[in-house]
């Protein structure tokens, strides 16, 4: 039985075909791709920075674990509940306006977070942060797929993911968490 499963000879690998499509440097020279990559990184970076720091800030302000958990629950609702209609907003308003709305919601989040230290401030700020992340990331993803060819999908997604998660690593360190 084992002889039937293992080939008698294994063929030597041939020369690998060159990867299809343009290099990442060529993709980055396209404004749509660059904006998509920056939008995704901005959305994730701001979200990660503030989300990671909020439980620590709440603890310093005298709030317990239950309060921090409630705030993070509202943040997660803000991140994912808009997913039911963000695509419709993009179709109706366009990709860039939805991304801009995400940036404005992130700025509103920062304004609310800086305006007070009550549970309502933390909750409203992180809820808006979640919605802003959704609009930025969904918009960025929608924009990105217009900027590369099908054969470049893996390379393009890899470049975007690398930039996004490198940004997240930096904001994790910057958050103090």
What are the residue ranges of the model-derived segments?
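Intracellular juxtamembrane helix-capping segments at the cytosolic ends
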Residues: 135-148
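A late C-terminal transmembrane helix in Major Facilitator Superfamily
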Residues: 152-177
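Pair of pore-lining "gating" transmembrane helices in MFS-fold secondary transporters
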Residues: 29-47, 127
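Juxtamembrane intracellular "pre-TM" segments in multi-pass secondary transporters
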Residues: 4-36
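Short amphipathic helix-loop junctions that connect adjacent transmembrane helices
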Residues: 52-69
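Helix-to-loop junctions at the C-terminal end of transmembrane segments
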Residues: 82-95
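Paired small-residue
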Residues: 109, 120-128
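Structural signature of the two symmetry-related core transmembrane helices
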Residues: 97-111
